[in-house]
Amino acid sequence: MAGRITKRGEALVVDTTGPDRLLVMKNYCHGVMSLVPVRHDPVTGGMDIEDLALKFTEKTAAVYFENPSYLGFLETQGQQIAEMAHARGGLCVVGVDPISLGVIAPPSHYGADIVCGDIQPLGVHMNFGGGQGGFISTRDEERFVMEYPSLLFGIAKTAVEGEWGFGDV
């Protein structure tokens, strides 16, 4: 999505990204976008900002990190990372565990453009071993919304006070 929006062909991905998620990213990006690893700071566990600055090119569509990370630490430099991406014409993409959003700031508060994650931690039933699903959210801007027009759902008030209806937009 970031590549289509920015018309660029690479994403910077912190090297602490979960291995399974990284495999999925490589699968989706194969032949379309290259993934460039960015080192993490061994003291804080966060993204190495100096390495990130060195890896940016005119081809960089997005910077991706997870919060909390696969290794369990919080990325405290989210706003700085997002500002760096935006200053260079890129997007900030954050992978989250939805359970964590009850206690840490949501990625939109520190500048994320695209947020994604796995819904399995929310207690999705295993249905014969296959109960997997994910979510994606973006800024409420046309350039993002137009990336998934057939998957857009909205909410609206109904005739009953306090009741909401849901449906395709």
Located regions from the model:
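Catalytic PLP-binding core of fold-type I/II PLP enzymes
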Residues: L74-I114
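Short, surface-exposed connector motifs at secondary-structure boundaries
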Residues: I5-E10, K59-A62, M84-G90
